[in-house]
């Protein structure tokens, strides 16, 4: 019953929102990786296909231009992948520590609140036990049973 009123219920909202945002970002990054890798593979295949030697000189110059264009696109896709890796590293280094520290601080605050609640509960139980013991002693010392035993 105490857990429902504690920090665990309130912490699930931001945590769920952060998880949803992280999932969305992960999907976007995976889509970006798929697009870039597909581009690299397609452009490489086109370069290999165009690299066949043909007889007419006009066709060879067109194929050379096509190879240049495909090589340029391949380099752009590879550069995009390198930027993505760099971005992932920066995110892991900077955002990871910040969010981890925030989460740790939040959990420390929640545990401090739970410790305070537990201490108050234990103090109340001690007071109740003390009052009950005094009441039992009072009944014992004033009872007829005690008088007959002494």
Curated annotation (Swiss-Prot):
Its main location: nucleus. It is found in: Nucleus. GO terms for cellular component: mediator complex. It holds the Pfam family Med22. Keywords: Coiled coil, Nucleus, Transcription, Transcription regulation. Residues 99-127 form a coiled coil. GO terms for molecular function: transcription coregulator activity. GO terms for biological process: regulation of transcription by RNA polymerase II. Belongs to the Mediator complex subunit 22 family. Component of the Mediator complex, a coactivator involved in the regulated transcription of nearly all RNA polymerase II-dependent genes. Mediator functions as a bridge to convey information from gene-specific regulatory proteins to the basal RNA polymerase II transcription machinery. The Mediator complex, having a compact conformation in its free form, is recruited to promoters by direct interactions with regulatory proteins and serves for the assembly of a functional preinitiation complex with RNA polymerase II and the general transcription factors. Component of the Mediator complex. PANTHER family: MEDIATOR OF RNA POLYMERASE II TRANSCRIPTION SUBUNIT 22 (PTHR12434:SF6). This is Mediator of RNA polymerase II transcription subunit 22a. It comes from Arabidopsis thaliana (Mouse-ear cress). The gene is MED22A.
